[in-house]
């Protein structure tokens, strides 16, 4: 029979072992191997049985064993040392504090940052993630902690976590949802001074109120607040709001996003009050999922500070960072406008919102407007609420500027104010212990964040590098065999049928990994375009390869499940099953061994649909060589020596033909470039040319792919400027915010009437030469704005056959006087910067010292 409800009972720890509680509930243990080794020493078999979960271990260990350890001097010495190390880690000055101590930087750095995401992949024991976004968010928190960045993270606590994947006998994905007991996880309940749970409330339509308690996961120095709606104070249907990650219909999803955004801000206010912390100055939203956080902050300023909507919006924009993680419109949450209006509007009919008291409902709805008037676009709302925005690789930044160009109509895509911060990965989480040990030996007292440390790899004997790679491949093969056996048994096989698994896969064979989510654009089955060719590669007598595949399809995506089934059916074939496997239930623990042990990491998305693709970074961090389409981060950092580029048939419109061409290129690379280099050995059995690629990969990519680099980029280029803007707008009783809001109102009112009446050019000789002086004069009607309210620019560049300016250069034009009828005169003289067919135009843009850029408001008038 099944239990109605599950809960966890923990054993009492002897007083001398009390430090185990702190070590087990701070998730820093998940990236600190000495702490993991300490827990393993309590009961090695139970540690494995509990899935390397310290909280579960302490709940299951025999009390007699704890009493024994309380008298074990060696164990107690290690415990005291690790407890002291954790306390030192939590309190000592780190990179962020060193920047503050530098003086000038202290004036720019925010006192706190709030980081919002719908998923967080911090550790296997807290399965609050589904894919790359969650793992990235987890790495962001861990690296922020390692750097001392004062971050508070906010998300939802999912009672079922993400699903467990298994396979049916015919290879079809089957999902089961674990029931997670928060009391059995490294979480603590946020309580007030009386010990009562702190609840946040959000008013929904029909007089319903959604309430949530707040679980706190301590990720090193960073608290992660997880909102949980499964409490008795909620009506039955509202208790299920946080049941599953990305589960349910759109009604369910919008409730989750309302709770994450509005409830998340209220959770931060409650947490900082209870812990007596300074409220965060900067708010970072990942995707539009938590977009409602910006509107809640507007409500706070309207209600508590007495600001009008526009002034409050100005303050919120100044201190908000928006990161887009998708390169396609289909990845954006778009709700029916009627649905959003139902949640936002108040039934009293006074135009004010019940969800966000004091705010006009029409202003809220307008923030999510897009070209389809029946839709509310969460990404558009996020961008309108943020003064700073970015994609997650250089290429993705370009793709995002084009995708959101409509919000800045009149600007070329390259001018859309969306930058980029290329993602990174958390080395202590993803690098194998062997590489971390080598890194410590090479670094000495220096930091692994410094590129010079990675250059010291030239000192290491190639045979030692190859020994590490071979050791990690052997570990992977053992893990693959165990997982393969378990999967076949779950699918109905018997032990008598599985003798072949003992010799499946070979620790000496070139090992290729492909593991990721299974949306169509990632092309899981590209490798199967020519099954006979793939079989030849797998079974080559001289240079065989072996292929390990893993990934989950969304439960509602039968197309993705069909792709998985194709791979499984091919891998089930007796002649190849010892060389290719699909491993079900891809998660962090499986991924880690894949990154460690695979020689080659395969990535073949449809370009440019991969926003970043951090799995390849994790492989590179372990000396794996990438074999990838030039997409995401690989487009940016591939240099010809750190892996291989799969040629992309970008101009081919026929998808089938494109797949055939790119699959053929993949097979050719494996057969003619990758395998020969791997199997070419010297007299010591070392593949010298391969190892030099491994060394080069570590030296050049190692410092770049670190999440510590990524977080520092965010601090320096986004968080610090946002904090400065916030202080300017919020200081002096919000006077600067009022001034900027007033300017924006005046500019938006005047802009449709602004006119460039005339443009005159003089000074050029009959045959213009490069460097010849061109004088431009523009006559402009400003419709009530002052000359210093605008920037007038001359724009010069090469022109194509349709007179479209290519790679334009802008030159600011000075105000030189007032003409007849109140028209203002602007002019400039500039040398011609280019040879060949050249053209020019003139445009007018807003100008205000509080704007991050002149294109921020999306206003422009062209001649």
Curated annotation (Swiss-Prot):
Positions of modified residues (N6-(pyridoxal phosphate)lysine): 618
Matching InterPro entries: Agluc_phsphrylas, Glyco_trans_35, Glycogen/Maltodextrin_Phosph, Glycogen_phosphorylase_DUF3417, Pyridoxal_P_attach_site
Example GO biological process: glycogen metabolic process
Enzyme class label: transferase
Pfam families: DUF3417, Phosphorylase
Cofactor dependency: pyridoxal 5'-phosphate
Cellular component aspect of the GO annotation: cytosol; plasma membrane
Known catalytic reactions: [(1->4)-alpha-D-glucosyl](n) + phosphate = [(1->4)-alpha-D-glucosyl](n-1) + alpha-D-glucose 1-phosphate
Keyword vocabulary terms for this entry: Allosteric enzyme, Carbohydrate metabolism, Glycogen metabolism, Glycosyltransferase, Pyridoxal phosphate, Transferase
EC number: 2.4.1.1
GO molecular function, a single term: pyridoxal phosphate binding
Miscellaneous section: Was identified as a high-confidence drug target.
Function: Phosphorylase is an important allosteric enzyme in carbohydrate metabolism. Enzymes from different sources differ in their regulatory mechanisms and in their natural substrates. However, all known phosphorylases share catalytic and structural properties.
Annotated family: Belongs to the glycogen phosphorylase family.
Protein known as: Glycogen phosphorylase
């Amino acid at each position: 029979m099944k239990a109605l409800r599950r809960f966890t009972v923990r054993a009492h720890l002897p007083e001398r072992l009390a430090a185990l509680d702190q070590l087990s509930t701070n998730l820093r243990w998940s990236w600190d191997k000495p702490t993991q080794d300490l827990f393993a020493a309590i009961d090695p078999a139970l540690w494995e049985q509990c899935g390397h979960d310290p909280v579960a271990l302490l709940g299951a260990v025999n009390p007699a064993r704890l009493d024994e350890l309380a008298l074990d001097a060696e164990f107690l010495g290690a415990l005291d040392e690790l407890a002291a190390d954790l306390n030192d880690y939590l309190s000592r000055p780190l990179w962020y504090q060193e920047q503050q101590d530098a003086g000038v930087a202290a004036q720019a750095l925010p006192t706190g940052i709030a980081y919002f995401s719908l998923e967080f992949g911090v550790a296997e024991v807290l399965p609050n993630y589904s894919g790359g976004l969650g793992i990235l968010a987890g790495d962001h928190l861990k690296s922020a902690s390692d750097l001392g960045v004062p971050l508070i993270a906010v998300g939802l606590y999912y009672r079922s976590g993400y699903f467990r994947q298994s396979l049916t006998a015919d290879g079809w994905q089957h999902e089961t949802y674990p029931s997670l007991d928060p009391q059995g996880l490294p979480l603590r309940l946020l309580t007030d001074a009386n010990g009562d749970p702190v609840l946040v409330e959000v008013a929904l339509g029909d007089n319903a109120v959604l309430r949530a308690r707040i679980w706190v996961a301590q990720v090193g120095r960073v608290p992660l607040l997880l909102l949980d709606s499964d409490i008795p104070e909620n009506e039955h249907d509202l208790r299920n709001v946080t049941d599953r990650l990305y589960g349910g219909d759109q009604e369910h999803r919008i409730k989750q996003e309302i709770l994450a955004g509005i409830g998340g801000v209220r959770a931060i206010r409650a947490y900082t009050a209870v812990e007596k912390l300074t409220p965060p100055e900067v708010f970072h939203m990942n995707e539009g999922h938590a977009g409602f956080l910006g509107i809640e902050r507007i409500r706070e300023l309207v209600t508590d500070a007495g600001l009008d909507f526009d002034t409050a919006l100005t303050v919120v924009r100044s201190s908000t960072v928006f990161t887009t993680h998708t390169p396609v419109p289909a990845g954006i949450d778009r709700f029916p406008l009627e649905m959003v209006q139902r949640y936002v509007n108040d039934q009293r009919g006074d135009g004010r919102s019940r969800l966000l008291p004091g705010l006009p409902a029409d202003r809220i709805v307008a923030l999510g407007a897009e070209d389809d008037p029946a839709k509310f676009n969460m990404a558009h709302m996020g961008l309108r609420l943020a003064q700073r925005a970015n994609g997650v690789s250089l290429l993705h930044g370009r793709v995002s500027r084009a995708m959101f160009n409509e919000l800045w109509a009149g600007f070329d895509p390259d001018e859309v104010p969306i930058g980029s911060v290329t993602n990174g990965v958390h080395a202590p989480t993803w690098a194998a212990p062997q590489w971390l040990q080598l890194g410590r030996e090479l670094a000495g007292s220096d930091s692994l964040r410094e590129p010079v440390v990675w250059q010291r790899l030239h000192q290491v004997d190639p045979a030692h590098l190859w020994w590490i790679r071979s050791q990690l491949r052997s570990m992977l093969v053992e893990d693959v065999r165990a997982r393969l056996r378990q999967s076949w048994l779950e699918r109905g096989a018997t032990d008598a049928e599985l003798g072949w698994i003992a010799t499946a896969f070979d620790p000496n064979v070139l090992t290729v990994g492909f593991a990721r989510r299974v949306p169509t654009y990632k092309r899981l089955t590209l490798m199967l375009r020519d099954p006979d060719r793939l079989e030849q590669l797998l079974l080559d007598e001289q240079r065989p390869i072996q292929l390990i595949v893993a990934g989950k399809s969304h439960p509602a995506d039968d197309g993705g499940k069909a792709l998985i089934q194709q791979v499984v059916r091919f891998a089930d074939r007796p002649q190849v099953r010892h060389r290719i496997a699909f491993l079900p239930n891809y998660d962090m623990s499986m991924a880690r061994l894949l990154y460690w042990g695979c020689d080659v990491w395969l990535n073949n998305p449809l370009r440019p649909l991969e926003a970043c693709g951090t799995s390849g970074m994790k492989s590179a961090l372990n000396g794996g060589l990438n074999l990838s389409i030039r997409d995401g981060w690989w487009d940016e950092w591939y240099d010809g020596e750190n892996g291989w580029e799969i040629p992309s048939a970008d101009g081919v419109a026929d998808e089938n033909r494109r797949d055939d061409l790119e699959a053929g290129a993949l097979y050719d690379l494996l057969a003619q470039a990758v395998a020969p280099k791997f199997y070419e050995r010297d007299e010591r059995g070392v593949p010298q040319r391969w190892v030099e690629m491994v060394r080069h990969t570590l030296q050049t990519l190692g410092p770049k792919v670190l999440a510590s680099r990524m977080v520092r980029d965010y601090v320096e280029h986004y968080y610090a400027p946002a904090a400065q803007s916030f202080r300017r707008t919020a200081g002096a009783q919000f006077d600067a915010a009022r001034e900027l809001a007033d300017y924006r109102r005046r500019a938006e009112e005047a802009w449709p009437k602004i006119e460039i009446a005339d443009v005159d050019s003089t000074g050029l000789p009959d045959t213009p030469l490069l460097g010849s002086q061109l004088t431009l004069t523009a006559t402009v009607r400003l419709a009530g704005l002052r000359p210093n309210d605008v920037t007038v620019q001359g724009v010069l560049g090469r022109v194509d056959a349709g007179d479209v300016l290519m790679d334009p250069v802008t030159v600011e034009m000075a105000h030189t006087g007032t003409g007849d009828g109140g028209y203002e005169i602007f002019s400039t003289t500039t040398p011609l910067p280019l040879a060949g067919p050249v053209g020019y135009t003139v445009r007018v843009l807003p100008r205000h010292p509080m704007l991050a850029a002149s294109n921020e408001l999306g206003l422009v008038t062209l001649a």
